[in-house]
């Protein structure tokens, strides 16, 4: 092979050539990229795998973006992930891609070590988490970042109507509370903070491992704290509304009904 051919200066850079169609592209990039991560949590760092989407806006006169540079940026990412590193990642992307606007989002499994309510036995709970960040460079050259966080939290709900009309017990089920929030980048919110907002408002939170005294506690706790899906979504929304770190939010609650072959759901969105 001709060594001169391997020199970048000797290769045509087609993607940087001029495009004459006068059509800017709002988003162009890569998705479905799996990449190892170290996650920072309230109880220490742990490894996970993120599924990434990264894109930039492309001006009308430019034929293509620098696709390989998205991966190059990921390869350099070696800090534990939290809100600060997510903001830094999307900021670093703009000059590297010669872009004025860019977006990064990735989903991973977040683990929290929890102690059972009575026995204290510890186990891990898993939550599906997505970080989202959009960076825009204004005419003055400064970069503004919008930071978002989404967490899907499994909880337990017990039906108030079933409790009221039944001589014994009440139907209950697992529920999912999915919260998508836009954060103030000048403050710090952890994944555990967001997860807690859902777990505190459920009939009961969940644990990976429970002993019999714990199971008794969960059963009695949920029975004394019944909630419709409407109650659940309103109570979680009220907690998010009161959190000054959150600028806007969407809360989705879904009950996987144990007495029906369908789900019940509710949604609240709010911008402060």
From Swiss-Prot:
Annotated catalysed reactions = GTP + H2O = 7,8-dihydroneopterin 3'-triphosphate + formate + H(+)
**InterPro entries tied to this protein:** GTP_cyclohydrolase_FolE2, GTP_cyclohydrolase_FolE2/MptA
Pathway where this protein functions:
Cofactor biosynthesis; 7,8-dihydroneopterin triphosphate biosynthesis; 7,8-dihydroneopterin triphosphate from GTP: step 1/1
**At what residues does the UniProt record annotate the site feature described as May be catalytically important?**
159
Which EC number applies? Answer: 3.5.4.16
Q: Which UniProt keywords apply?
A: Hydrolase
Q: List the Gene3D superfamilies hit by this protein, alphabetically.
A: Urate Oxidase
Q: Name which cysteines form disulfide bonds.
A: none
One Pfam family assigned to this protein is GCHY-1
What are the GO MF terms of this UniProt record?
Answer: GTP cyclohydrolase I activity
Q: Which domain of life is it from?
A: Bacteria
**Which GO terms fall under biological process for this protein?**
tetrahydrofolate biosynthetic process
Give the UniProt family note: Belongs to the GTP cyclohydrolase IV family.
Its job: Converts GTP to 7,8-dihydroneopterin triphosphate.
Per its record, how is this protein called by name? GTP cyclohydrolase FolE2
According to its UniProt entry, this protein's organism is: Polynucleobacter asymbioticus (strain DSM 18221 / CIP 109841 / QLW-P1DMWA-1)
Gene name linked to the record: folE2
């Amino acid at each position: 092979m001709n060594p001169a051919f391997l020199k970048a200066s000797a290769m045509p850079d087609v993607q940087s050539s001029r495009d004459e169609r006068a059509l800017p592209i709002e988003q162009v990039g890569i998705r479905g990229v799996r990449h190892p991560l170290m996650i920072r949590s309230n109880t220490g760092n742990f490894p996970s795998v993120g599924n990434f989407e990264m894109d930039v806006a492309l001006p009308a006169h430019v034929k293509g973006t620098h696709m390989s540079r998205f991966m190059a940026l990921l390869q350099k990412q070696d800090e534990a992930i939290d809100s600060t590193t997510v903001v830094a990642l999307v900021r670093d992307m703009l000059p590297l891609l010669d872009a004025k606007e860019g977006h990064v989002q990735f989903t991973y499994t977040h683990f929290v070590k929890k102690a059972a309510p009575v026995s204290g036995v510890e186990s891990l709970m898993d939550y599906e988490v997505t970080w989202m960040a959009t960076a825009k460079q204004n005419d003055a050259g400064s970069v503004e970042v919008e930071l978002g966080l989404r967490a899907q939290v499994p909880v337990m709900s017990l039906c108030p109507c079933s409790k009221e009309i039944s001589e014994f017990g009440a139907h209950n089920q697992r529920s999912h509370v999915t919260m998508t929030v836009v954060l103030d980048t000048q403050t710090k919110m952890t994944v555990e903070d967001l997860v807690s907002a859902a777990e505190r408002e459920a009939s009961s939170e969940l644990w990976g491992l429970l002993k019999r005294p714990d199971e008794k506690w969960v059963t009695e706790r949920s029975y004394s704290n019944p909630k419709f899906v409407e109650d659940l979504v309103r109570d979680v929304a009220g907690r998010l509304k009161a959190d000054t770190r959150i600028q806007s939010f969407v809360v989705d609650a879904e009950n996987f009904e144990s007495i029906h072959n369908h789900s019940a759901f509710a949604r609240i969105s709010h911008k402060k």
